[in-house]
Amino acid sequence: MKIIKVTVVYALPKIQYICQVDIALGSTVKDAILESNLLNLTNDVSFHHNRIGIYNKTVHLKFKIKDGDRIEIYRNLTIDPKEWRRNNVFLSKKLKKIY
């Protein structure tokens, strides 16, 4: 049985979890996440609430991983992107009036 190396990452605003995992060839994304123990390190990670990707491309939990893959666990958005842009434009206009 061949062993491959993958990285499982989860980033919060102030801390990043980066776990190197040695796992059997033919394993899935879910297997690698379970092997990384990230589910026990933080309460923010859940298979039901977080999207998963490899190199910024969303994949399913049953996706077969390859040697060198970086499995990324994405956080849920805290604010709608349109709302954030509206707030940002409003603040920048307000600052221009002050200066």
UniProtKB/Swiss-Prot annotation:
It comes from the Bacteria. InterPro entries: Mopterin_synth/thiamin_S_b, RnfH, RnfH_sf. Coiled coil: none annotated. SUPFAM superfamilies: MoaD/ThiS. Disulfide bonds: none annotated. Belongs to the UPF0125 (RnfH) family. This is Protein RnfH.
